[in-house]
């Protein structure tokens, strides 16, 4: 089961997203209203997924960098009621993996997370296959000496 942490100043938004994630089979190991306490939850639980309100990211861009540095495999989802192209581009450049739109629609939230997880796994497998291919000795077609 994938573990998740929610960071949002709105208790209502945290509660709704918590319900969506729990109903979707995720283990919400913590939720908080500040990035500082959110980072403490990451240290304690090492979640696979972090959902962070847009305001939290925009007020403290270092939080995304810190998560990417210390938990590089953790997927970061920006949560907001609106996204424009500039925001999405800036968020991607910071390392945000996906976007969750308020008001929450359970199917959309769960599909967004699932599709992002699948894409990440595919990228990791491709990278491993590429590494394995580069590390494999070249076969020149000559018979083995023996």
What kind of region is each of these model predictions?
Residues 86, 104-113:
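C-terminal output helix
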Residues 11-30:
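Two-component/phosphorelay signaling modules centered on CheY-like receiver
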Residues 40, 61-73:
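Short amphipathic alpha-helix used as the core "switch/output" element in two-component signaling
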Residues 62, 83-98:
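Alpha4 helix (beta4-alpha4-beta5 surface) of REC/receiver domains from two-component response regulators
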Residues 48-65:
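Conserved phosphotransfer microenvironments
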Residues 118-146:
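CheY-like receiver
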Residues 26-35, 41:
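Short hydrophobic/Thr-rich beta-strand motif most characteristic of the beta2 strand and flanking loop
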């Amino acid at each position: 089961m994938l573990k998740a942490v929610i960071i949002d100043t709105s208790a209502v938004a945290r509660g709704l997203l918590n319900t969506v994630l729990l109903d979707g089979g995720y283990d919400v190991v913590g939720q908080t209203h500040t990035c500082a306490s959110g980072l403490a939850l990451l240290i304690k639980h090492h979640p696979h997924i972090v959902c962070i309100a847009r305001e939290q990211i925009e007020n403290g861009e270092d939080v995304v960098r810190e998560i990417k540095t210390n938990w590089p495999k953790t997927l970061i989802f920006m949560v907001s009621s609106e996204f424009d192209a500039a925001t999405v581009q800036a968020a991607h450049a910071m390392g945000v993996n996906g976007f969750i739109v308020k008001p929450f629609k359970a199917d959309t939230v769960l599909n967004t997370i699932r599709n992002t997880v699948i894409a990440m796994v595919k990228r990791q497998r491709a990278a491993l296959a590429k590494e394995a291919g580069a590390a494999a000795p070249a076969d020149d077609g000559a018979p083995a000496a023996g």
